[in-house]
From Swiss-Prot:
Lipidation (S-palmitoyl cysteine): 3, 5
InterPro entries listed in its UniProt record: DLG1-4_PDZ_assoc, DLG1-like, DLG1_PEST_dom, GK/Ca_channel_bsu, Guanylate_kin-like_dom, Guanylate_kinase_CS, P-loop_NTPase, PDZ
Phosphotyrosine modifications at: 240, 580, 715
Domain SH3: 428-498
Biological source species: Rattus norvegicus
The entry's keywords: Cell membrane, Cell projection, Cytoplasm, Lipoprotein, Membrane, Palmitate, Phosphoprotein, Repeat, SH3 domain, Synapse, Ubl conjugation
Protein's recorded name: Disks large homolog 4
Length: 724
């Protein structure tokens, strides 16, 4: 009887609870986080007498320096190998065995499965134990330089294919694109299905696994999936495809990433890795044996696929990303449809749901005629294990998308001055707003390719606000406008959806709304002005004191502090105007406070203390940013005094995040700091110039400095009197 020998390999995943704290990094490194590939001279990498090996072969090698910025989930890849446990044969190299979807490495796009790590920053890991390599990566800091080696891929055969559209269109399906990689680490667009009887099938040259480089004159390298689909759809009857044919060595598994080893099982690696990066401990193995394992959403938009049309029962376990899909619909009984599936999320990994599915029920709750709000509540309150009855209805979903498309066309026509009877006349054309929330177009429906994503604090020039749901806008950088133009959700749309969310939250809580009146923030109107002073700095949230101290000590020529006022008697060693402005009359200081000459004041031991507007102005007019340790209320008082501050809120992601950033405080102190920060954000969000987050103080401090640099002026955006 044959024996089956299973060999396991050590692994380490750089994310979630295993993510180490970020260490100090050289000041110049953050600017290199997105640097282009650098081919490293092999002489600098090879020690005398050391023979480099990759996968036990002597193939032609290439070298690359890759700089990654550690994200919320760490570096986003898995490794195996080492002198104590070689991954392939007797090769002691440290190999990349998995690229985590959505992680830092996947977003950068250059690191590949089977790359061999030679150096981590300046640490040589070519011939070390597995634990030593893990330690080198843990101690590498927030900005990590990897020197990697890989075998050069065989040259692809590029050819041009002419297709003539038939009744089934072009007759093939695609997958891939930026943010939706079909093969981890590769943004290319791949052919995943040839429709029998279609144009591609009749021509015979296009094959599964082919890479589409261009459609007519439109390049498809490093584009989003939606853009590739649009390029293929927006063609006439005759279409020219520029196609790269893969090497024969890889044709055995067109869906798998090129694997140049014979002893490494991609299937095994996926099977033992999935549960750990989802942050779950479900006993059910999620073995991704389907060829769709690298394709989060079914992308059969160019031809019909044989997909069961009967209702299906799907069980999904809620993960750290929720259920991992978005829904649309719920108006006029049109049904609830899945519009987006998050790559790497529970729905994606189950392989059971697809865009275009109608959700018929959730845990027995009938959603066939539910409103969008009712469906959202049912999904939110479904618990950890969710049973969904879904039915694939591409025709109905296509009609829903067609309605969105018609709206988009109307908006476009309106913006060009043609107008339509269904759109209101446009009372507001050409105004500027500042976003008070983050918007990710991929999480919304309908406008995936033409919507404009933005972050909190971004300034947008609204070109056309004639529609109630979508405004046409252009992003503004500094004192110039970019070519980034698209559609953003209107104030009404944002507030309606947020109220629905808050209503669902209150409905699902045991205490109900308790009379709470949550304010919904969307945008504020802004106007541009020129300033001739250094803007004061107000940092709020956990670690603000450390950030203030570091700015003053690191850049004494750029930052300063003002001298406070007090009615306390002067002590012998104190100097008036240096330590304090000593006010002899309490009555006078009280009058000045009532006259709004102080941005903040209080009483301690029967003496008044305060920071005057004039003290801040003196520092600002000296060309130094005045660092202020005040409350958020001071922001509005400074604005009223025409000293527009840069207010930066340091937002903790969680209680654990507070403890990780400041290891010297107790859990109780961290909980109080987290609660204070949460309340501060709820009450003063509109006062913040920017919101920063980070896994370490070093990361936060770097972002704080970048915000100050970006918002220093001389041209700045300030709140306008006009209300939306």
């Amino acid at each position: 009887m044959d024996c089956l020998c299973i060999v396991t390999t050590k692994k380490y995943r750089y994310q979630d609870e295993d993510t180490p704290p970020l260490e100090h990094s050289p000041a110049h490194l953050p600017n290199q986080a997105n640097s282009p590939p650098v081919i490293v001279n092999t002489d600098t990498l090879e020690a005398p007498g050391y023979e480099l090996q990759v996968n036990g072969t002597e193939g032609e090698m290439e070298y690359e320096e890759i700089t990654l910025e550690r994200g919320n989930s760490g570096l986003g890849f898995s490794i195996a190998g080492g002198t104590d446990n070689p991954h392939i044969g007797d090769d002691p190299s440290i190999f990349i065995t998995k690229i985590i979807p959505g992680g830092a490495a996947a977003q950068d796009g250059r690191l590949r499965v089977n790359d061999s790590i030679l150096f981590v920053n300046e640490v040589d890991v070519r011939e070390v134990t597995h634990s030593a390599a893990v330690e080198a990566l843990k101690e590498a800091g927030s900005i990590v330089r990897l020197y990697v080696m890989r075998r050069k891929p065989p040259a692809e055969k590029v050819m041009e294919i002419k297709l003539i559209k038939g009744p089934k269109g072009l007759g093939f399906s695609i997958a891939g694109g930026v943010g939706n990689q079909h093969i981890p680490g590769d943004n290319s667009i791949y052919v995943t299905k040839i429709i029998e009887g279609g144009a591609a099938h009749k021509d015979g040259r296009l094959q599964i696994g082919d890479k589409i480089l261009a459609v007519n004159s439109v390049g498809l390298e490093d584009v989003m999936h939606e853009d590739a689909v649009a390029a293929l759809k927006n063609t006439y009857d005759v279409v020219y495809l520029k196609v790269a044919k893969p090497s024969n060595a890889y044709l055995s598994d067109s869906y798998a990433p090129p694997d140049i080893t014979t002893s490494y099982s991609q299937h095994l690696d996926n099977e033992i890795s999935h549960s750990s990066y989802l942050g779950t401990d479900y006993p059910t193995a999620m073995t991704p044996t389907s060829p769709r394992r690298y394709s989060p959403v079914a992308k059969d938009l160019l031809g019909e696929e044989d997909i069961p049309r009967e209702p299906r029962r799907i069980v999904i376990h809620r993960g750290s990303t929720g259920l991992g899909f978005n829904i649309v619909g719920g108006e006029d009984g049109e049904g609830i449809f899945i519009s987006f599936i998050l790559a790497g999320g529970p729905a994606d990994l189950s392989g059971e749901l697809r865009k275009g599915d109608q959700i018929l029920s959730v845990n027995g709750v009938d959603l066939r005629n539910a409103s969008h709000e009712q469906a959202a509540i049912a999904l939110k309150n479904a618990g950890q294990t969710v049973t969904i009855i879904a039915q694939y209805k591409p025709e109905e979903y296509s009609r829903f998308e067609a309605k969105i498309h018609d709206l988009r066309e109307q908006l476009m026509n309106s913006s060009l001055g043609s107008g339509t009877a269904s759109l209101r006349s446009n009372p507001k054309r050409g105004f500027y707003i500042r976003a008070l929330f983050d918007y990710d177009k991929t999480k919304d429906c309908g406008f995936l390719s033409q919507a404009l994503s933005f972050r909190f604090g971004d300034v947008l020039h609204v070109i056309d606000a004639g529609d109630e749901e979508w405004w046409q806008a252009r992003r503004v950088h500094s004192d110039s406008e970019t070519d980034d133009i698209g559609f953003i959700p209107s104030k009404r749309r944002v507030e309606r959806r947020e109220w629905s969310r808050l209503k669902a939250k209150d409905w699902g809580s045991s205490s109900g709304s308790q009379g709470r009146e949550d304010s919904v923030l969307s945008y504020e109107t802004v106007t541009q002005m020129e300033v001739h002073y250094a803007r004061p700095i107000i940092i709020l949230g956990p670690t603000k004191d450390r950030a203030n101290d570091d700015l003053l000590s690191e850049f004494p020529d750029k930052f300063g502090s003002c001298v406070p006022h007090t009615t306390r008697p002067k002590r012998e060693y104190e100097i008036d105007g240096r330590d304090y402005h000593f006010v002899s009359s309490r009555e006078k200081m009280e009058k000045d406070i009532q006259a709004h000459k102080f941005i903040e004041a209080g009483q301690y031991n029967s003496h008044l203390y305060g920071t005057s507007v004039q003290s801040v102005r003196e520092v600002a007019e000296q060309g130094k940013h005045c660092i202020l340790d005040v409350s958020a209320n001071a922001v509005r008082r400074l604005q009223a005094a025409h000293l527009h501050p840069i207010a930066i809120f340091i937002r903790p992601r969680s209680l654990e995040n507070v403890l990780e950033i400041n290891k010297r405080i107790t859990e109780e102190q961290a909980r109080k700091a987290f609660d204070r920060a949460t309340k501060l954000e709820q009450e003063f969000t509109e006062c913040f110039s920017a919101i920063v987050e980070g896994d370490s103080f070093e990361e936060i401090y770097h972002k704080v400095k970048r915000v100050i640099e970006d918002l220093s002026g001389p041209y700045i955006w300030v709140p306008a009197r006009e209300r939306l």
